[in-house]
């Protein structure tokens, strides 16, 4: 006869087993920096959002040093609509004129960033919100594409403020807005910002949370997930058109960060519950991992 106490004991043993399996990974990554680009459905679904924040806090509590980088495209579109500004895109990039740039900065720095900071702190962490302007963290330059306005790319990363924060147990949360040498604000791709910060901070891992299982050989077949590949294989997938559309800048930023010393880059499905913990603290791992 199976009693309820037996089920309870089995459940408790299962939890203990999970914790035991996590131990070698906690030991391996304690003190190491991991940069997480937070975006996609993980930002839109309140349940997933809470899980991601709690997972980030857990990683911090076991001695791993997470740095969060975020965008906020849907939120920007929503506020542009409220203000009667029609969102415009060119070759997948947001056309960012002066009025749009004001909204981008207001939403990313003043709203989305502070919401993430608040959620992490509510979950028991100690987060500090930043943008590229703070302590000259990121210097931007124009993207160089005609007709897209104040869309920029990363020119330089000055890590002093991030290093100070992580060394003292804080969780930095960085929004993808920065200025050039003249003080002009630019809208930056959050994936690219995450990759450049990971490289500058000599991070152990760069993790991009997306709305897909990872890199797929066949976009229409989730079972065609490529679990592990190296830089050369990643470049070949782009050349062959297997990696296309919005996945190209994600793979490119992973490749660039690896070339600058990041140990591993991961593209994960942010919709999967506790995907960060599965990737970092278990034997199985999830999503696609790119290595040098």
Curated annotation (Swiss-Prot):
Q: Which GO terms describe its biological process?
A: arginine biosynthetic process via ornithine; L-arginine biosynthetic process
Q: Name one GO cellular component term.
A: cytoplasm
Gene3D superfamilies registered for this protein in UniProt: Acetylglutamate kinase-like
User: Pathway of this protein?
Assistant: Amino-acid biosynthesis; L-arginine biosynthesis; N(2)-acetyl-L-ornithine from L-glutamate: step 2/4
State its location(s).
Cytoplasm
InterPro entries in the record: AceGlu_kinase-like_sf, AcgluKinase_fam, ArgB, Asp/Glu/Uridylate_kinase, Glu/AcGlu_kinase, NAGK-C
Q: Keyword set for this entry?
A: Amino-acid biosynthesis, Arginine biosynthesis, ATP-binding, Cytoplasm, Kinase, Nucleotide-binding, Transferase
Primary residence: cytoplasm
- Residues given in the record as substrate binding sites: 72-73, 94, 187
Could you tell me which HAMAP family the record lists for this protein?
A: ArgB
The similarity comment for this entry is: Belongs to the acetylglutamate kinase family. ArgB subfamily.
* Name assigned to this protein: Acetylglutamate kinase
- What is the originating organism of this protein? Trichodesmium erythraeum (strain IMS101)
Q: What gene is behind this protein?
A: argB
């Amino acid at each position: 006869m199976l009693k309820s106490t037996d089920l309870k004991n089995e459940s408790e043993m299962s939890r203990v087993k999970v914790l035991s399996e996590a131990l070698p990974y906690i030991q391996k990554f304690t003190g190491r920096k991991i940069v997480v680009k937070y975006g996609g459905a993980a930002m839109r679904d309140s349940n997933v959002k809470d899980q991601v924040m709690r997972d980030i806090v857990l990683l911090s509590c076991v001695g791993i040093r997470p740095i969060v980088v975020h965008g906020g495209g849907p939120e920007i579109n929503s506020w542009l609509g409220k203000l009667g500004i029609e969102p415009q895109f060119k070759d997948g990039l947001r056309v960012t004129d002066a009025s749009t740039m004001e909204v981008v900065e207001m939403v990313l720095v003043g709203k989305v960033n502070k919401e993430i900071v608040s959620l992490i702190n509510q979950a028991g962490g100690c987060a500090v919100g930043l943008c590229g302007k703070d302590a000259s963290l990121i210097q931007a330059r124009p993207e160089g594409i005609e007709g897209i306005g104040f869309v920029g790319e990363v020119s330089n990363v000055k890590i002093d403020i991030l290093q100070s924060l992580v060394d003292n147990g804080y969780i930095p949360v960085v929004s993808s807005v920065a200025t050039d040498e003249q003080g002009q604000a630019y809208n930056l791709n959050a994936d690219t910002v995450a990759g450049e910060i990971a490289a500058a901070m000599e991070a152990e891992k760069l993790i991009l949370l997306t709305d897909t299982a990872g890199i797929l050989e066949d976009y229409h077949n989730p079972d065609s997930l490529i679990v592990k590949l190296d830089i050369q294989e990643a470049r070949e997938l782009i050349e062959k058109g297997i990696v296309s559309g919005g996945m190209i800048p994600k793979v490119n930023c992973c490749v660039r960060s690896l070339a600058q010393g990041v140990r591993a880059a991961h593209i994960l499905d942010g919709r999967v519950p506790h995907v960060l913990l599965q990737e970092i603290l278990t034997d199985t791992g999830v999503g696609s991992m790119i290595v040098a």
